[in-house]
């Protein structure tokens, strides 16, 4: 089993929100490396090239990845589209998000789950 790392952008068969179908999509691995090494699962959030403004999202560009990869288009990380997936479902890594961009994503997740006042 390949161990994927936090900040990896990987391809997976990702379900539509109504669970009616799935499509191979890029996702960002959120779970930390220790969790990923010891678990059969990873925690991810979805990416899209639909850049329409939306709460709980962060825009990333092709220059926001550390490794030359196949992130071909500016994308929106959907911090409100979270899933736990078996690592066996992951098809391949295509890029790795820079730490400063990952911090923007985790800030949006924090905004999503923080207590409303």
Question: Predicted segment positions?
Answer:
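C-terminal terminal-subdomain/extension
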Residues: 2, 66-117
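Short, charged beta-turn/beta-strand-edge "cap" motif at the junction between a beta-strand
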Residues: 15-19
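Compact nucleic-acid interaction/catalytic patches
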Residues: 20-24, 29-62
């Amino acid at each position: 089993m390949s161990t994927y790392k936090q900040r990896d952008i990987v391809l997976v068969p990702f379900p539509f929100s109504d669970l009616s179908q799935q499509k191979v999509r890029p996702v960002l691995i959120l779970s930390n490396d220790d969790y990923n090494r010891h678990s059969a699962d990873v925690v991810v959030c979805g990416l899209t090239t639909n850049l329409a403004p939306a709460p709980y999202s962060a825009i990333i560009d092709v220059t926001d990845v550390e490794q030359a990869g196949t992130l071909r288009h500016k994308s929106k990380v959907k911090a409100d589209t979270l899933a736990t997936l078996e690592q066996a479902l992951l098809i391949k890594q295509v890029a790795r998000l820079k730490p400063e961009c990952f911090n923007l994503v985790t800030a949006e997740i924090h905004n999503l789950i923080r207590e409303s006042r």
